[in-house]
Amino acid sequence: MTERFEVTTGIQKALSMKSEVFGMLLDGTPSEPSISKESVHHLSKIVSGKPLVRPAWFLDTNQQGEGIVDVTTHLVDLVQWEAFPGQIIDRSDIKIISSKRWTTSLAPDQFKNITGLDSYPEYLQKDVKSDTLNIYCNGEINYTIKGKHAKVSVIWDYKAPEGTGDTHHSVMRGSKSDLIIKQGEAENYKPTLYVISKEGENFESNLEKALESIQGEYPGIEADKISDSKWKILIPEVLKIGHEAHFGQVTDNFLKYYKDGQLPVWEVPNMITKYYTTTQAYKKALKK
C-alpha cells in the first residue's frame, strides 16, 4: 500500500498517536466522520514527464473493477492503519452505513487521447450511450469501524486543470486537535498537513515536543504557526520522494517480510477486513 509511505500521511499518523496533541479519536457522525479520506484522480495524465497511455481494458469495469472497489482499497487501508495502528480489525467491527457509485463520461476524442484507439472495443460497447463512454469509476463509502465513523471516496475526472494533478484530502478528528491533509490551490497542489487545535493552553509547546520526538523518522520537520489555533507542518523536500518512489519502498517492505518469513500479526486479518469493507459497500451501492 504505497500511501502508507507518503510523508504527510506518516506524520499525520504519528501525531495522532501523541495524546498530548491529538487526544482521542472522536466517534464522529455520518456528516462529520472521525476519519475521512478522499482522492481525486485523472484518466489523462503525465507520468515521469510523458503522457500516460492506458490500455482500453483499464476502462472496462468487468476487467478492471469499479472505482468503489479499486482505489478505495488504499483509502480503507489508511483508515485502518492510522485509526487503529497495530490492532487486528475483524469483519464484525465494520458496519456499512451507506455507499454509492457513479460514472465518469468520456467523449470519443477523450477516449482516443487516453488509449490511442480510434474506436471503442466491443467489450466497452455495453457502457457506450450516444457515442459517450460511461465508466463506473467513482465511489463513496460511509461506515463505522470499531464504532468510529469513517468515510472514503474516490473520484476519477478526465483531466486535471493545467498545473494541477491527482489530489488527496484527509481528516482525522481528535478531542484536542484535528489533523488535516489538503492539496488544493492554496497548497500549490502539494500534500500539506495542518494541525488545528481545540485547546489553547500548552498546545504549542506540546506540538513542538511531539515533533521533536519523531525527528528520528522525519528529520527536519517543523511547525509554522498560521494563527492562534492553526499550524502548518513544514517538511524538508528531501523527505518528499514522490509517488513512484513509494513502490520501491513497498517492495523493500515485502522483501523484508519475505526474508523474515512472516507478516505483522495484524496485516492478514486486516487485509481480509479491508476487502470485506469494499465488497460489502459495492453490494450495497448496487441496490440503489
Language model features with spans:
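C-terminal helical cap and adjacent loop that interface with cofactors, partners, or active-site loops
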Residues: 70, 75-80, 87, 92, ...
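Predominantly a Rossmann-like dinucleotide-binding segment in NAD(P)-dependent oxidoreductases
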Residues: 2-130, 254
